[in-house]
């Protein structure tokens, strides 16, 4: 294998009994047992037990001095472990290595934590990331990430895709998330932007005739971070020419099935279900529904229009209001304390409260219900609620009534909270499996109340459905896009669309977004020009590599599948980035910092 070692520690098995081996690695733990020293030696493949006998005084003296995380090399003979001392949890658990020679390659200061401590704070882990990455789970996560990327490349290469790099330094187009800006030293007052995606470049590669493109690349967005977001993230970016929307979806659905099978031996559905955006929002309040949770919304807006209860009738009679019920089978067993906790939970999403009805006996109608709101509802409304929700004895119905967005967010989050709870799992409301689906037919635009204009729901290069082209100039809100998202267990794995490939249509979309011809030419003139040279029909999508690996690894955060991630404050605790820079560097970039204005208190 090399002059320093013959095998990886974790790969020494009973097949090597009787053989001499040379091993290198780190001391996981050292134990003294009755004059014999045992060392758990670790490398990236796992652990092996090394036995140091005092019969070899020089070696034994070295073994007495080693401590956790010392980097060492040993030579010795593989032998079976004594009966009753085998460790079934280790690949090397049936053997041990009797040490002949031991060399300390490099000692270690006392580590700030034990590598097998499962209760470390994330701050500690990220500050000492070099040590954190030695932990078996992190080694597994990053090797899984490599395997997923390799499987993606193998699949796309076999399908005739070409890996082409696109620029990291590009032009700022302030649509969507904030750009990370890079000042140009040689062009004073001018800035590059780090790419939020290679979107326009990959479209131009289709115009250039490359037909099938991909790259696994870094993208950058200066936005507020959550558990599934990073300022820099890795995208599996793909684009194709001369394929229909259905053909694009079929191709990448097959890719994802292949990658899951080869990377973690999981068989995803032979055919992913397809759901329109409108249906997903109606049933689940989300465009990325977690289908493992067997709870759905019941639409009650019409039912509540004439009730004498403003909490329900107000939103029901509002243009952008919505009233829904969420029936939880067996939820009558949920305690008042748990209901209060759920009420506080939905408040995070803007809900002003959480109305509920416990169904004790359906047959008794009003008299069989338990809730402070029942007195505010007339008999016809109660009957319709029970009928539409399909309520049974022992159920609870939660209600959301507010602006549609608040209802969707709050009750959608409550649906997941209940489904993933111990109650949900123990009562069959949660199915522990893989549930992929496509969400299609997104609105082309959504209305921005603050700016009083239409904005692109995905991006302004998404094609509207052919029969909706007429609405671009008359009623943009009616436009449905040829857009699609692949969703898995409530996470958006990837998303894309068929693109606009005609310059006249692209210009109409810009105008619908209140981007006039002059502004469009200044920002996107190079794309508009390219589309005039016989641009082919094309489309594609991009997958989030970080998210895919996070799901496969069962990790809590994408920070657990990235070697050196940023915190939720976009900081690297290991290197202390971002940092201040020298005044000289700022002068070279023609930049002067303004002092921050002091915060005033009322």
UniProtKB/Swiss-Prot annotation:
GO process annotations (BP): aspartyl-tRNA aminoacylation
Annotated residues for binding of L-aspartate: 175, 221, 458, 499
Alphabetic keyword roster: Aminoacyl-tRNA synthetase, ATP-binding, Cytoplasm, Ligase, Nucleotide-binding, Protein biosynthesis
Pfam family, one: GAD
Catalytic activity annotation: tRNA(Asx) + L-aspartate + ATP = L-aspartyl-tRNA(Asx) + AMP + diphosphate
Residue ranges of the region described as Aspartate: 199-202
EC id: 6.1.1.23
Family: Belongs to the class-II aminoacyl-tRNA synthetase family. Type 1 subfamily.
Protein name: Aspartate--tRNA(Asp/Asn) ligase
Source organism phylogeny: Bacteria, Pseudomonadati, Pseudomonadota, Betaproteobacteria, Burkholderiales
């Amino acid at each position: 294998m090399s002059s320093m070692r013959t095998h990886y520690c974790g790969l020494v098995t009973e097949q090597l009994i009787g053989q001499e081996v040379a091993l290198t690695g780190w001391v996981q733990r050292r134990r003294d047992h009755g004059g014999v020293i045992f060392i758990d030696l670790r490398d990236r493949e796992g652990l092996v037990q090394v036995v140091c006998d005092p019969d070899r005084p020089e070696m034994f003296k070295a073994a007495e001095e080693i401590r956790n995380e010392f980097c060492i090399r040993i030579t010795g003979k593989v032998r079976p472990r004594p009966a009753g001392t085998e460790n079934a949890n280790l690949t090397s658990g049936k053997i041990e290595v009797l040490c002949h020679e031991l060399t300390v390659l490099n000692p270690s200061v006392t580590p700030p934590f034990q590598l097998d401590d499962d209760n470390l704070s994330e701050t500690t882990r990220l500050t000492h990331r070099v040590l954190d990455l030695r932990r078996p789970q992190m080694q597994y996560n990053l090797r899984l990430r490599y395997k997923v990327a390799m499987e993606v490349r193998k699949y796309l290469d076999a399908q005739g895709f070409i890996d082409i790099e696109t620029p990291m330094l590009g032009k700022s187009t302030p649509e969507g998330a904030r750009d990370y800006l890079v000042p140009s030293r040689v062009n004073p007052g001018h800035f590059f932007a780090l790419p939020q995606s290679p979107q326009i470049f990959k479209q131009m590669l289709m115009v250039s005739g490359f037909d099938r493109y991909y790259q696994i690349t870094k993208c950058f967005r200066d936005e507020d971070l959550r558990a599934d977001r990073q300022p820099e993230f890795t995208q599996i970016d793909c684009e194709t020419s001369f394929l229909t929307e259905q053909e694009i979806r079929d191709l990448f659905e097959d890719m994802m099935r292949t990658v899951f099978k080869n990377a973690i031996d999981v068989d995803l559905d032979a055919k992913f279900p397809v759901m329109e955006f409108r249906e997903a929002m109606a049933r689940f309040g989300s465009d990325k529904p977690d289908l493992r949770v067997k709870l759905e919304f019941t639409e009650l807006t019409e039912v509540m229009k004439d009730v004498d209860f403003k909490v329900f009738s107000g939103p029901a009679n509002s243009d952008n209001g919505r009233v829904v019920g969420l029936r939880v089978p067996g939820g009558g067993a949920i305690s008042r304390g748990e209901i209060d906790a759920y009420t506080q939970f939905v408040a995070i999403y803007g809900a002003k409260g959480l109305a509920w009805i416990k169904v004790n006996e359906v047959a008794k109608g009003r008299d069989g219900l338990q809730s402070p709101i029942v007195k505010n509802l007339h008999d016809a409304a109660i009957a319709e609620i029970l009928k539409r929700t399909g309520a049974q004895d022992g159920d609870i119905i939660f209600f959301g009534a507010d602006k549609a967005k608040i209802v969707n967010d709050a009750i959608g989050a409550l649906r997941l909270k209940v489904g993933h709870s111990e109650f949900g799992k123990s009562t069959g409301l949660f199915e522990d499996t893989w549930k992929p689906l496509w969400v299609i037919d997104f609105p082309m635009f959504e209305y921005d109340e603050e700016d009083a204009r239409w904005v692109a729901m995905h991006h302004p290069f998404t094609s509207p459905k052919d029969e909706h082209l007429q609405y671009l100039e008359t009623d943009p809100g009616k436009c449905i896009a040829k857009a699609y998202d692949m969703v898995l267990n409530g996470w958006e794995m990837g998303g894309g669309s068929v693109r606009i490939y005609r310059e006249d249509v692209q210009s109409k979309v810009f105008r619908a977004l209140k981007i006039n011809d002059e502004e469009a030419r200044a920002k996107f003139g190079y794309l508009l020009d390219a589309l005039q040279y016989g641009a082919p029909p094309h489309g594609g999508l991009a997958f989030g590599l970080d998210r895919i690996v996070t799901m496969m690894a069962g990790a809590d955060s994408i920070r657990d599948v990235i070697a050196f991630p940023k915190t939720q404050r976009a900081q690297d605790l290991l290197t202390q980035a971002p940092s201040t820079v020298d005044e000289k560097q700022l002068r070279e970039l023609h930049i002067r910092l303004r002092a921050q204005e002091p915060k005033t208190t009322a």
